[in-house]
Amino acid sequence: LVSPEIAAVCFDVDATLVDYEASTRAGLRELLGTDDAWAEWCVLTDQHYEGYLAGQIGFEPMLRQRTKDFFARRGELLCESEVVRREERRTAAVRRAWRLFDDALPCLRALRNLGLRLAAITNAAGELQRAKLDALGLHAEFDAVLISGELGIAKPHRAIFRRACRALGVRPGQAMHVGDRLDTDALGARDAGLHGVWLDRSGSGMIPQGAGISMIGQLA
């Protein structure tokens, strides 16, 4: 995976190092008693996430709006205070279910043993993501942590990848970025001059012809 010219590796967090699906399903079960609406939730998440990436809405307001729209689609119109209450319940359940993928720490530590510098680049609210990194013992694994909610820039914008490279003291061409989203992670990193690696844990994806990125199915 790591060629000789690589001096640093950056990682996405959710669905790359942290099992996003498991914790998100736990949040749905808190709200509905079941996670049968997982597919619907994913579609709604992608729709709202686009607005966040476009700078149309902040991360935490986006989460509340998603919850409001989710229940509206199910015929339940929530007042703002009830939206907040349910989103807080959901978030608490998600936090209780945070866990790393089994290959996350072995990968990070193997790269560290090779002398590589490491960074996390994640699109999320700062407080939420730092709490997650602390709870899972990830903070100490990274030389730099870049969170969109703290910086005002998000993947796939080139600026956040290049800022990570500066923090690590490397040129973009000396860095690799690994993430589960083809567009936001792998292609975004490529466009910023890094080596983009798409982590497709499901094995169901396909790299577009001539994309100039790599694809892996697991971290270690």
Description of each model-found segment:
Residues 1-9, 22, 36, 81, ...:
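Asp-based, Mg2+/Mn2+-dependent phosphohydrolase catalytic module
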Residues 3-102:
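N-terminal helical cap/lid subdomain that shapes the substrate entry/recognition surface
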